[in-house]
From Swiss-Prot:
PROSITE patterns referenced in this protein's UniProt entry, alphabetically: HTH_ARAC_FAMILY_1 (PS00041), HTH_ARAC_FAMILY_2 (PS01124)
Record lineage: Bacteria, Pseudomonadati, Pseudomonadota, Gammaproteobacteria, Enterobacterales
Major localization listed first in the record, in broad terms: cytoplasm
Summary of subunit composition and partner proteins: Binds DNA as a dimer.
Protein name: HTH-type transcriptional activator RhaS
Protein task: Activates expression of the rhaBAD and rhaT operons.
Gene Ontology terms: biological process: positive regulation of DNA-templated transcription; rhamnose metabolic process
Residues flagged as site, Interaction with sigma-70: D241, D250
Compartments, as annotated in UniProt: Cytoplasm
Gene: rhaS
Length: 278
């Protein structure tokens, strides 16, 4: 597995933070780092495999990667990211207690993926630009300013994720997408889902297409197929059982959609035929 080292990314040994744009981010094999990073998805879509678990990401997704996490990107479509790198929560010269602003693992669950709305994303871009512009200055006041801006970023992300609520259509769509990640295997009535999240059906279709490039049903099918591929790789369950477990009522229809999405059949994935592409 590829290991990325801080010496190759941070401008100097004194720099607490480094900014790495990926415009766009191509598919990238599994790797980990000796530093931490916050991945901010600007726009586009892709699959983020995080510690073996697949997540569909799009504009507004924020992922917190620790130095022992492993991750990779697959099936990227104009996926544009900004990576905010930092050595560790305890490696800042002027800040302490940052762990309280970061997601915390509890009972074996690490809430690595957050979502923010477009308004917050604009504010995030401004803070990232401030840090990027001062990257080369190693004077104490400049380092302190960058650390303060980094803390502002954490506060903004945490506040936005906690109080987003149902304030506007953008926020409601974010909550809907998070709900689909957990309920992908259920039978979904888009009329009912739209009503639950206080969206008109037309708004749901339009906004999901803008965020992901996919219609609601195609987005749901992709979620199901991604989860199914993970089970094919990591369990011994039959193709039929996996199809039903992931929300498909017909295994033949599942196999057709699977090949169309990944260019491999479920059986070929089970046999590891795609291993060279992982």
């Amino acid at each position: 597995m590829t290991v990325l080292h801080s010496v190759d990314f941070f401008p100097s040994g004194h720099s607490p933070v480094a900014i790495e744009p990926r415009l766009p981010q191509a598919a990238f094999p599994e790797h980990h780092h000796d530093f931490h990073e916050i991945v901010i998805v600007e726009h586009g879509t892709g699959i983020h495999v995080f510690n073996g678990q697949p997540y569909t990401i799009s504009g507004g997704t924020v992922c917190f990667v620790r130095d022992h996490d492993r991750h990779m990107y697959e099936h990227t479509d104009n996926l544009c990211l900004t990576n905010v790198l930092y050595r560790s929560p305890d490696a800042f010269q002027f800040l302490s207690g940052l762990n309280q602003l970061l997601p915390q693992e509890k009972d074996g669950h690490y809430p690595s993926h957050w979502r923010v709305n477009q308004s917050t994303l604009q504010q995030v871009r401004q803070l990232v630009t401030q840090m990027e512009q001062a990257e080369e200055n190693t004077e104490s006041h400049a380092l302190a300013s960058r650390e303060l801006t980094f803390m502002q970023l954490l506060v903004l992300l945490r506040r936005s994720s906690l109080v987003e609520g149902l304030e506007n259509n953008d926020a409601r769509l974010n909550q809907l997408m998070a709900w689909l990640e957990d309920h992908f295997a259920e039978e979904v009535s888009w009329e009912t889902v739209a009503d639950v999240f206080s969206l008109s059906l037309r708004t749901l279709h339009r906004q999901l297409k803008q965020h992901t490039g996919l219609t609601p049903q195609r987005y749901l099918n992709r979620l199901r197929l991604i989860k199914a591929r993970h089970l094919l790789r990591h369990t011994d369950e039959s193709v039929t059982d996996i199809a039903y477990r992931c929300g498909f009522g017909d295994s033949n229809h599942f196999s057709t959609l699977f090949r169309r999405e990944f260019s491999w059949s479920p059986r070929e994935i089970r046999q590891g035929r795609d291993a060279s592409l992982q």
